[in-house]
């Protein structure tokens, strides 16, 4: 089934849009798999985007995870920055090789990452970055907690950077408040962890990603169909995405994405034998030839025009080239004509 590539800068709403799309497709009974940075790293690590070697390894891990999941039965959603068009082209080739459609979901946050928005987002995340542990009232005998403990339920924002923070249950009392890790919050029913707070990305990493970001272009075949959503208020174009994923025909495979036919052992043996015999015959025939003659070799109908003395090294190099090309397009029907085909190749290559 199709591949959905989600791209955009950190804190642009990618994880929230991914979860929204996952829920919509899962409600139709479809199997949906989400691949993100945390699922391949084991834990969210924003600093990996500041290290070229680590980022390269991350892209390789994401590509491998997508390739393992990609099939004609399941929907795969890749939730990552995906800011390099070359990497998006690799994903396009994966989908094309699997003969399954692909679409791109581009999440945009206006004026991000500006300094003012970063400071405001960091302030909001500091207010939300608390972890509450509870103890049932029965264990405390219904008594109030120690001094300084919070007695009233504190409702948190339902959405923070695409992750869902569960409300505190009325049956439990807070016991202590400790710093938390926002990336550890899991979305119910999802296989992926929530996107980390934007303050987890150092400002220099955000600015570097913004400068390096290669925006999708619908004129590129690997970037279309392209769906752009601005902010979190704009509704997700679910109808158009469904049409692109399930109604469009998958792109046909071409030579770079389809498996080459396997050549039989006898074909390769006869190819090697025929070209070797031609080389031996040419080296012997040119001993009595003068420039301008046409060499007639035994067992062939194609003459070889003799223009200058040929060395064994030059003929061996052309023979290797011919064998490499012929192995890519094996055809048992050409077995009787291998020697003539090699002579035609020599006539075109020799000057």
From Swiss-Prot:
<dbReference type="InterPro" id="IPR027417">
    <property type="entry name" value="P-loop_NTPase"/>
</dbReference>
<comment type="similarity">
    <text>Belongs to the KTI12 family.</text>
</comment>
<feature type="modified residue" description="N6-acetyllysine">
    <location>
        <position position="143"/>
    </location>
</feature>
<dbReference type="Pfam" id="PF08433">
    <property type="entry name" value="KTI12"/>
</dbReference>
<keyword id="KW-0597">Phosphoprotein</keyword>
<keyword id="KW-0007">Acetylation</keyword>
<feature type="modified residue" description="Phosphothreonine">
    <location>
        <position position="156"/>
    </location>
</feature>
<dbReference type="GO" id="GO:0005524">
    <property type="term" value="F:ATP binding"/>
</dbReference>
<dbReference type="InterPro" id="IPR013641">
    <property type="entry name" value="KTI12/PSTK"/>
</dbReference>
<feature type="binding site">
    <location>
        <begin position="8"/>
        <end position="15"/>
    </location>
    <ligand>
        <name>ATP</name>
    </ligand>
</feature>
<keyword id="KW-0067">ATP-binding</keyword>
<feature type="modified residue" description="Phosphoserine">
    <location>
        <position position="157"/>
    </location>
</feature>
<protein>
    <recommendedName>
        <fullName>Protein KTI12 homolog</fullName>
    </recommendedName>
</protein>
<feature type="modified residue" description="Phosphoserine">
    <location>
        <position position="198"/>
    </location>
</feature>
<feature type="region of interest" description="Disordered">
    <location>
        <begin position="177"/>
        <end position="197"/>
    </location>
</feature>
<keyword id="KW-0547">Nucleotide-binding</keyword>
């Amino acid at each position: 089934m199709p591949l959905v590539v989600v791209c955009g800068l950190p804190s642009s709403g990618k994880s929230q849009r991914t979860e929204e799309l996952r829920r919509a497709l899962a409600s139709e009974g479809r199997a949906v798999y989400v691949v993100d940075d945390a699922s391949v790293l084991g834990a969210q690590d924003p600093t990996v985007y500041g290290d070229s070697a680590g980022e390269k390894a991350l892209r390789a891990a994401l590509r491998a995870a997508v390739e393992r999941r990609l099939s004609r039965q399941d929907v795969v959603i890749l939730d990552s920055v995906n800011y390099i068009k070359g990497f998006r082209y690799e994903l396009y080739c994966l989908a094309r090789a699997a003969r399954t459609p692909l679409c791109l979901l581009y999440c945009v946050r206006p004026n991000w990452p500006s300094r003012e928005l970063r400071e405001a987002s960091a302030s909001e995340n500091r207010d939300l970055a608390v972890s509450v542990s509870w103890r049932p009232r029965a264990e405390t005998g219904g008594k109030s907690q120690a001094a300084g403990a919070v007695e009233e339920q504190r409702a948190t924002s339902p959405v923070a950077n695409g992750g869902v923070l569960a409300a505190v249950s009325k049956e439990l009392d807070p016991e202590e408040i400790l710093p938390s890790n926002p990336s550890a919050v899991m979305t119910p029913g999802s296989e992926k962890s929530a996107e980390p707070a934007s303050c987890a990305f150092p400002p220099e990493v955000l600015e570097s990603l913004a400068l390096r970001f290669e925006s999708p272009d619908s004129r590129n075949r690997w970037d279309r169909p392209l769906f752009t959503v601005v902010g979190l208020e704009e509704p997700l174009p679910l109808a158009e995405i469904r049409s692109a994923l399930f109604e469009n025909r998958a792109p046909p495979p071409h030579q770079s994405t389809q498996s080459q036919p396997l050549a039989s052992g006898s074909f390769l043996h006869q190819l090697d034998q025929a070209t070797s015999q031609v080389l031996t015959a040419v080296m012997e025939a040119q001993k009595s030839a003068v420039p301008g003659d046409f060499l007639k070799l035994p067992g062939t109908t194609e003459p070889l025009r003799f223009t200058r003395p040929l060395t064994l090294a030059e003929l061996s190099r052309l023979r290797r080239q011919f064998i490499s090309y012929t192995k890519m397009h094996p055809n048992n029907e050409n077995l009787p004509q291998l020697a003539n085909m090699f002579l035609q190749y020599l006539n075109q290559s020799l000057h």
